[in-house]
Amino acid sequence: MKKSTITIVVPVFNVEDFVNETLLSIKNQISQADEVIVINDGSTDRSGNIINNFAQLQGWKIIQTLNQGLGLTRNFGRSIASSDYIYFLDSDDIIKDGLILRMREIIHQYNKPEMILFSGESF
């Protein structure tokens, strides 16, 4: 099965208590062909330092912007993504183990669908 590339876009704004766990949930699920774009949307807490330290070690794209809000930040991430599929992950959420693999299976099984939808859980 050929791997389709996936971009994960993570907009970040003042989530120092959560963002490290978000990034950890991505780390072991992506392949080298995938892309992670972490956008610091003008955070005034330690979020910027946390993402810089973590994401640079992973070779992920880190972008600093003035605060524009979630919608514009997501759209900006979409505009610079270079893959077949884009996953918007909020910086206070985590990806369940196996999700990216399951996305790849669906992409292959349904011959590259235009969209993949799934649900989430609160915890």
What name fits each language-model region?
Residues 1-123:
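Nucleotide-sugar donor-binding/catalytic module of glycosyltransferases
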